[in-house]
Amino acid sequence: AMPWSEFDPFLSALVLDYLVDALRLDSSALEPLQLLRSRLVRSVNLDPQTIDDARTSAYTLWVLTREGTMTTAQLEALRASMTSRFEGWERDAAASFLAAAYSRLRLRDEARSLVKSTPSTARAAGAWTPETAAALAASALSEAGLGQEPAARFLVSMAGEDLARTFAAGIVSPLYAAAAARAALTPEVGGLTAGESAASPDLVCTRRADG
């Protein structure tokens, strides 16, 4: 995720997720955050060919929304692409990331329409694992004010079970460790207070994208 390294969309989005929090504590995080944000905005894939790529794009859009970027048009484009290409995507963690972004934009109806189904992380592959998907999706829904939705509570429970099982086994990948730590910063999973969690930029969408 560094300027001189090969660009990895998922890892870059995860780094930006952490930088958003780091900026609250240290203004020196602003420059790397701005550089990474610009790169992610330019590179987000709105026409993914696999559900794993779609999940990465959805997570990226959630993190960009959380950071303060207006993403309404991209959310609409990605949602349309997934609807036409991936049957049952509404149960994937990708739907949770889109719901979180819509909620942060105060598009509540769109957000809640995407957390009606019981989530499943079984399809997670590529850069993802089921455990990583559950941890980051639970974190996103919690931070977006959807933590009391049944889908979010299911993901929180799943993430907690994954965490206990994985650490008991003693084998933890760096990416999963980062995702699990990210989840631990949210109120429902444990970490930040509700007030601290609410300190992120609050965007309001005033005009929907055409189409």
Regions found by a protein language model. Name each.
Residues 1-211:
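Large, well-folded core regions of big proteins
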